Curated annotation (Swiss-Prot):
Substrate binds at R134, M314. Belongs to the alanine racemase family. The keyword Heme does not apply. CDD domains: PLPDE_III_AR (cd00430). It comes from Nitratidesulfovibrio vulgaris (strain DP4) (Desulfovibrio vulgaris). This is Alanine racemase. GO terms for cellular component: cytosol. Its EC number is 5.1.1.1. The modification N6-(pyridoxal phosphate)lysine is found at K36.
Length: 376
């Protein structure tokens, strides 16, 4: 549920997302933007509509409900629901909204078949497990699956999808290529029965760095939002030039001195070693600013990097503003992004947080949000 009770401000740059999409288009023939989980916190409807206007032929969401919400907003291109139709209500909604759900098993296939007709079959995407050990059919199911599909004219398979486990790690390229080989065998079996079925295997990392795994449709996700999935690896150059799309700022509640020898916040985990000035900002773990950032986080105040002091509280956090002249109550402090070279990236914040940029964006993006709609 979106957070609505605080004074945080999330600003999403649609222009940056479109720039990243264009960057991806230079290496991918048919990228299907992944906008699940509220577009990784960036706003499902706004991001989806901007990408459709830019020429995206389809987008991928997580649930059928997300897809229906996007369709209701006026999205006219194809929508693939990656988690599939989880129950009968989902199956009905997918059929009525023209959403393409993934199918994970025979029961799900039959659930969807009940919603279609021979004249108006429900389009589906077949989900295969090639190494994630998570969801879907296996390579050994292809023959029996095709036999069952031939008896169900009320469904039409239009795509087969699988997901790569370590495409972002070149030290495990053998596993990635093994997944690719398994998917190739799956596609051969499917196309002997359904010649027009499309294949989709590549995530952001594979889209950027492994063209041999592109197949017909590519599924960039985190790269759309400015995070390099290959950061810190020998393949990092393939993800350079992506633009961050989210910034998060909060107001200063109070500025006061912290004399040498005085502690601050719960647990007294920080004691000033010299006279300092602190600002208490309106952000805490209830605002999805993690308690793991206690004594580790950084923020941008007055154009400068400043450290978090002591423990992050439920709705407040202390920062050291000793070297930020003139800072006052009501000024904005950036938890993510921020003006000038001091900006904090999602990847950097994730490192401090002990997580990944995906979680940072999904969680902070739940705060009050607006979009910069200027797309050139």
């Amino acid at each position: 549920m979106p957070i609505s009770y605080n004074k945080a401000s999330v600003v999403v740059s649609l222009q940056s997302i479109i720039a990243n999409y264009r960057r991806i288009r230079t290496v991918a023939q048919r990228p299907m933007p992944v906008i699940k989980s509220d577009a990784y916190g960036h706003g499902l409807e706004a991001v989806g509509m901007a990408l459709e206007a830019e020429g995206a032929r389809e987008c991928a969401v997580g649930t059928v409900g997300e897809g229906a919400k996007l369709r209701k907003a006026g999205f006219g291109a194809d929508i693939v629901a990656l988690l599939g139709a989880l129950d009968r209500e989902d199956a009905q909604l997918a059929a009525s909204s023209g959403i393409i759900p993934t199918v994970l098993d025979i029961a799900g296939l039959e659930r969807l078949a009940a919603q279609g007709t021979t004249e108006r079959p429900v389009r589906v995407a077949l989900k295969f497990d090639t190494g994630m050990a998570r969801l879907g059919f296996t390579e050994h199911d292809v023959s029996a699956l095709c036999e069952r599909l031939r008896t169900l004219p009320s469904v039409r398979p239009v795509m087969a999808v699988s997901h790569l486990a370590v495409a972002d790690d070149p030290t495990q390229s053998a596993f990635t290529m093994a997944q690719g080989a398994a998917f190739a065998r799956i596609m051969a079996g499917l196309r002997s029965n359904f010649p027009d079925i499309m294949g989709s295997l590549s995530n952001s990392a594979a889209t950027l760095a492994h063209p041999q795994l592109h197949w017909d449709v590519q599924r960039p996700g985190i790269a759309l939002y400015g995070s390099n999935p290959l950061r810190g690896t020998a393949l990092a150059r393939h993800g350079e030039g992506l633009l961050p799309a989210m910034s998060v700022s909060v107001p200063v509640l109070q500025v006061h001195p912290l004399p040498a020898g005085r502690s601050i916040s719960y647990g007294r985990t920080y004691t000033a070693t010299k006279d300092a000035t602190v600002a208490i900002i309106a952000a805490g773990y209830a605002d999805n600013y993690s308690r793991a950032l206690s004594g580790r986080g950084v923020a941008v105040a007055g154009g400068r990097r400043v450290p978090v002091l002591g423990r992050v509280c439920m709705q407040t956090t202390a920062i050291d503003v000793t070297d930020v002249p003139g800072i006052a109550t009501g000024d904005r402090v950036w938890l993510l992004g921020g003006p000038g070279p001091a900006t904090v990236s999602a990847d950097e914040l994730a490192d401090l947080w002990g997580t990944i940029s995906y979680e940072v964006l999904c969680l902070l993006g739940m705060n009050p949000r607006r979009h910069d709609d200027s797309v050139e």
